[in-house]
Amino acid sequence: MRLSEILTVALVTGATAYNLPNNLKQIYDKHKGKCSKVLAKGFTNGDASQGKSFSYCGDIPGAIFISSSKGYTNMDIDCDGANNSAGKCANDPSGQGETAFKSDVKKFGISDLDANIHPYVVFGNEDHSPKFKPQSHGMQPLSVMAVVCNGQLHYGIWGDTNGGVSTGEASISLADLCFPNEHLDGNHGHDPNDVLFIGFTSKDAVPGATAKWKAKNAKEFEDSIKSIGDKLVAGLKA
C-alpha cells in the first residue's frame, strides 16, 4: 500500500495527528524497502519467521532510520520504565522496571519514563550481536524522533534501547497515538512493516527541560516537542 492510500484510510477512520509534510511523504515512498548506506544489519522485527533482514540506514542526511526489504519495520509494544504494569501494560510479558536512560531523565524531576504517558521509541541494540549504538552516529539520548505511522506524523523521543537484536518497538502511549483503533496493549503490537522511525543526529533534537516531562498524557507531552520536531522534519531531504 502506498502512502497516499494509507492517508485515505487514516482520514476515513478519523485518526488525528500532525499533518504529514510533502518532503516526508516523498521520503517515505522513496526509501521504502531500500537502503544503500547500511549502518548496521542483521536485526529482526521481533518475528523470527521474517528473518534478520532489518537494518539501521543512513540514506537520509542527518538522520537514521530502520529499513528492511519488506518496507520499514513494525511496532511492537514496550512498557519499560515507571508504572510498567499499569493500564494497558498489565499483560506485558517482558516489561522491565527501568529504561536505558533512567539516570538521564531524573534531572527533569521524574523517576523514569512512563510508557503510558511518554511516547518513546526503542532504538539501538546492546548486549547481543549484532549491536548498534546510535550515539556513535550523532544521536543523543532523549532526543526527538519522528514517526510515520498509519499515514500520519507523530513525534516521540528516543527513550530506550533493545538488549536483543529486534527492532521496531515503541511505548504503548506512542502506539495508541499511531493506531488508536487497533486495540494494542503490552502483548499485542502492530505487525505490518510500514512504520518509519526517524532519529536525528543534530544536537538541536534534544528538547531538554523544554519538554513537558511531567505531562499527564501522551498528547500533552507530544505537543511540547512538536516545534522541535517540525524544524527537524522540515530540514530532511528526500
Curated annotation (Swiss-Prot):
Keyword Repeat: no
Pfam families: Glyco_hydro_75 (PF07335)
Top-level taxon: Eukaryota
Alphabetic keyword roster: Allergen, Carbohydrate metabolism, Glycoprotein, Glycosidase, Hydrolase, Polysaccharide degradation, Secreted, Signal
GO CC annotations on file: extracellular region
One MF term in the entry's GO annotations: chitosanase activity
InterPro entries: Chitosanase_fungal
Sites carrying sugar chains: 83
Documented effect of changing residue 213 to R: In strain: NCPF7367
EC number, UniProt record: 3.2.1.132
Compartment annotation: Secreted
Keyword Signal (UniProt): yes
Catalysed reaction equations from the record: Endohydrolysis of beta-(1->4)-linkages between D-glucosamine residues in a partly acetylated chitosan
Main location (coarse class): secreted
Stated role: Chitosanase catalyzing the endo-type cleavage of chitosan, the deacylated form of chitin. Chitosanase may be crucial in the degradation of the deacetylated portion of chitin in the fungal cell wall. Chitoolisaccharides produced by the hydrolysis of partially N-acetylated chitosan are known to have many biological activities, including antibacterial activity, immune-enhancing effects, and elicitor activity. The chitosans with higher degrees of deacetylation were shown to be the better substrates.
Protein known as: Endo-chitosanase
Protein's organism: Aspergillus fumigatus (Neosartorya fumigata)
